[in-house]
Amino acid sequence: MTVSNTVDQYTVLSGDRSKIKDLLCNRLTECGWRDEVRLLCRTILLEKGTGNSFTVEQLITEVTPKARTLVPDAVKKELLMKIRTILTENESEIEDAEEP
């Protein structure tokens, strides 16, 4: 199991995943990322979606890499710090529980 999978599993089990997702959604909205991605989708659809042959899957495949690069570094850092805090708190709780 990778570190990423372990963190993902822990956050799901502890209930912190929804808090992290809420924080991410709020920050992406606040910084205008969602609007940028919406415009990117609209632009791609206008360029390639003249017929009905352009599928949602194709749009997602094209938009995802560009959208990921648009996420501000400050948002990435904040989420990373939040995850580290959650894991550190968990580690402290485990150590406290193990002490006699």
From Swiss-Prot:
Its main location: nucleus. The keyword Cytoplasm applies. Coiled coil: none annotated. GO terms for cellular component: cytoplasm; DUBm complex; nuclear periphery; nuclear pore; nucleoplasm; SAGA complex; transcription export complex 2. Transmembrane segments: none annotated. GO terms for biological process: heterochromatin boundary formation; mRNA export from nucleus; poly(A)+ mRNA export from nucleus; positive regulation of transcription by RNA polymerase II; protein transport; transcription elongation by RNA polymerase II. GO terms for molecular function: C2H2 zinc finger domain binding; chromatin insulator sequence binding; TFIID-class transcription factor complex binding; transcription coactivator activity. Gene3D superfamilies: 1.10.246.140. InterPro entries: TF_ENY2, TF_EnY2_sf. The keyword Isomerase does not apply. It comes from the Eukaryota. Component of the nuclear pore complex (NPC)-associated AMEX complex (anchoring and mRNA export complex), composed of at least e(y)2 and xmas-2. Component of the SAGA transcription coactivator-HAT complexes, at least composed of Ada2b, e(y)2, Pcaf/Gcn5, Taf10 and Nipped-A/Trrap. Within the SAGA complex, e(y)2, Sgf11, and not/nonstop form an additional subcomplex of SAGA called the DUB module (deubiquitination module). Component of the THO complex, composed of at least e(y)2, HPR1, THO2, THOC5, THOC6 and THOC7. Interacts with e(y)1. Interacts with su(Hw) (via zinc fingers). Involved in mRNA export coupled transcription activation by association with both the AMEX and the SAGA complexes. The SAGA complex is a multiprotein complex that activates transcription by remodeling chromatin and mediating histone acetylation and deubiquitination. Within the SAGA complex, participates in a subcomplex that specifically deubiquitinates histone H2B. The SAGA complex is recruited to specific gene promoters by activators, where it is required for transcription. Required for nuclear receptor-mediated transactivation. This is Enhancer of yellow 2 transcription factor. The gene is e(y)2. It comes from Drosophila ananassae. Belongs to the ENY2 family.
